[in-house]
């Protein structure tokens, strides 16, 4: 018997997504398309008449603004919001700011494929000479982190390792207590939660790429195990395309 509902949404397209650049912890703004995606997702939540008691997001504006849009459109702007670096996107280290073509030219296509598709191989670290080192590592939003907590690069495994404790210690107890939760975050931090909920293998989660801006609904039992497959919210065409895109990701290219 279903006892809980969880809604998650990956932020709308950012300006750096649009330019095909590795974004990671760089605080990119939503693109026009991304802002529209957030509005569409918000409207889908409104149409489904879903209410929230508490929301969680990262400390990066593309996720925060997506959340704001949802709360605005659904007239729930008063709902408490918790922001945490633990829900940030994967830190792409030395690749941050490069587009895929530049990265392939610099490091070789095979190496880039390993960084993108390997579960536990991190990209090269972001050193102090990197263009974005100061704007990320020295930003005051991270002033409270211990030196060992502040990454210079992350694999997907690393990203999940810092996101999951927050899920286990903060979010899961709220859901079990009956709170209706919305998480607006990033492709890789949300992958960590999906992997945990569904007990997916390392390989399977690497092949799952969550669509931007489309709310994902989970019905969970009292042990927070899904009672049904993840469900997308939106008009029929949007949902069909999202489901096809997710299904196709498991197939050989």
Swiss-Prot record:
The record marks 186 as: Transition state stabilizer. The modification Phosphotyrosine is found at residues 132-133. The keyword S-adenosyl-L-methionine does not apply. GO terms for cellular component: cytosol. Substrate binds at residues 10-17, 23-24, 62, 89-92, 100, 116-117, 187-188. GO terms for biological process: canonical glycolysis; gluconeogenesis; glycolytic process; Notch signaling pathway; response to mercury ion; spermatogenesis; striated muscle contraction. It catalyses: (2R)-2-phosphoglycerate = (2R)-3-phosphoglycerate; (2R)-3-phospho-glyceroyl phosphate = (2R)-2,3-bisphosphoglycerate + H(+). Keywords: Glycolysis, Hydrolase, Isomerase, Phosphoprotein. SMART domains: PGAM. Belongs to the phosphoglycerate mutase family. BPG-dependent PGAM subfamily. Interconversion of 3- and 2-phosphoglycerate with 2,3-bisphosphoglycerate as the primer of the reaction. Can also catalyze the reaction of EC 5.4.2.4 (synthase), but with a reduced activity. This is Phosphoglycerate mutase 2. It comes from Mus musculus (Mouse). The gene is Pgam2.
